[in-house]
Amino acid sequence: MAQIEQSSDQGMMVEDHLFYLPATMTERWNYTEHRLGTVTATYDDCPDFTWQITPSDSELISLSDIRLELEVHLTRADGTPLQTEDCVSSVNNLLHSLFQSVSVELGGRSISDRSNLYFLRAYSENLIGFCTDAQKSQLTSAGFIIDNNYTAPYNGVFIPAVQGGTKARVTFNSSGAHQRAEMINQIYPLQLRGRIHSDIFQQEKPLLTGVPVFIRLTRARTALSFTAVDSAHLPKIAIRNPRLLIRKFEMTPAYSNAWAKQLMTRKCYASY
């Protein structure tokens, strides 16, 4: 019944299949994509973001294909644009470093880890769970830039003299930090996209019909996500247009019949 995608005829793979291949695609029929906004109002200092995926009677949700998209607007604390001498840079894996925890509920029951170490889990999984090619291409959309050591004198920028002193050099501790600083100075706003690092979104099982999904991401402190020449120059962060990319699909007749045949003889248990 199942046909491995790798053994199929050659063709152009979709974006999310460049570094991830589902075991089988035979259960999918007539899939659609949706972008969902938050269920609550958002503002620049919003402490958390909440989404609710309403249940469907006929479509399954592809859990491994759910993606988070958002825009990051950075300014000085007084609202003026950032300057080069502020030496603002982000930590690695910026998209996920903006949040300290993720909460996922299925049918009103929490199934996620309640710890406030979401950013550490996301960084660890991106660092050891993907090949170097993926880290240099696909993961850059989430602000992941590999850190390498820099050697003087190419590792800093001069800032103006303060109170009659001489110019000072501010150094970045890695080439990745320098590249992220250049990205912040050249791109406004920063558009980031990536997967949500939670157990339920790391499996090939689709979500059964009739089950509502509730997702909440809680913001982290600015000092956890960004560095600057000093604490007074840390940027003001505004997260705007947060969206979830959802892929739904209808079951093929063969896949649906296989389920129905099993349900005739035994109970169906779905674990996530």
Set out the residue ranges of the language-model regions:
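Short, low-complexity Pro/Thr/Gly
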Residues: 1-272
